[in-house]
Amino acid sequence: MQRLDPWHGTCNLQFVAGSSGSQFQGGCTAPLKLMRAERGENGRCELPLLHTAGGLVGGDQLSINLGLRPNSRCLLTSVAAQKIYGSIGRSQLHPLGTWARQQVSAELDADSDLEWLPQELVLYADALFEQNLSVTLPMDGSFLSAEIVRLGRTAANETLGQGCWRSDVQIQRQTSEGRRWELVDRLEISDDALKGFHGLNQQPVFGTLVWAAPFPLQTTKINNLLDDIRQDRKALEGQMHCGALPQGLIARYSGFSSRDARFWFSRIWARTRQARNLASPKIPRVWPLQEYPLRP
């Protein structure tokens, strides 16, 4: 039976650059909990986030607010896959179901670098979930996100049913002439879109990777980078496409394998590090079933 007292977990974090690398200040409220931070390559603060309740039901909310001060570096990930449980028809008070929501907001200062790489989201049958990602960064800031959603527990022959997944991504640049849109990406997938030929054509895994680069990419460089990313699709199953943004790139995955989605996105992650002459990323200790060492 659906709880009558939905959660509203919050996480407010500020990252600052220090002599020994980037550090964080702030904290979380239940059901969110911070795990032990580690120092990664280039002084990056690697911080896993745990959802102690095990998943979200209708009415639950998560609010994550991130601030990166000048020259700070952060990798924020999650300890496990996020589960969204069915809502429609589970409550006599709300028979049509209620939405679970997640809001992530990030403000980046000069020469800062944020990698937002949560583990996959699993949407159960009849679940309603809306996620919003809002990022503001300077011209020399870098932001990378990769999010994967599995629409229905396919191993149990489950589909979305009457459920629905919504996503709204907004990325803006601060320029000398004001704010400039880098990306506005709004998506909604219901069971019709999941099954439809002009939708996902019954492919239950969908993912998006976005990189807002810290510098303009010349035409030759971005074309070579996209060619390398397309080559990285070898031996992976699914439909994988990528393209350029005004100052960065976007990649999409649709298919049947969340593992292959993770592999491809992780290879792209390594490419973005390489493009900035940074050390190749190492797999966070909380990630399972991951390709190692990372290509390239």
Swiss-Prot record:
What does the UniProt keyword field contain?
Answer: Chaperone, Cytoplasm, Nickel insertion
- Family the UniProt entry places it in: Belongs to the UreD family.
Subunit relationships? UreD, UreF and UreG form a complex that acts as a GTP-hydrolysis-dependent molecular chaperone, activating the urease apoprotein by helping to assemble the nickel containing metallocenter of UreC. The UreE protein probably delivers the nickel.
Molecular function via GO? nickel cation binding
| Name of the protein in its database record | Urease accessory protein UreD
Q: Name one Pfam family in it.
A: UreD
Q: Does the keyword Cytoplasm apply?
A: yes
Q: Where does the chain cross the membrane?
A: none
Its domain of life reads Bacteria
What is the organism of origin for this protein? Synechococcus sp. (strain CC9311)
Principal cellular location given in the protein's record: cytoplasm
Which locations, inside or outside the cell, does it occupy?
Answer: Cytoplasm
What GO cellular component entries does it have? Answer: cytoplasm
The job of this chain, per UniProt, is described as: Required for maturation of urease via the functional incorporation of the urease nickel metallocenter.
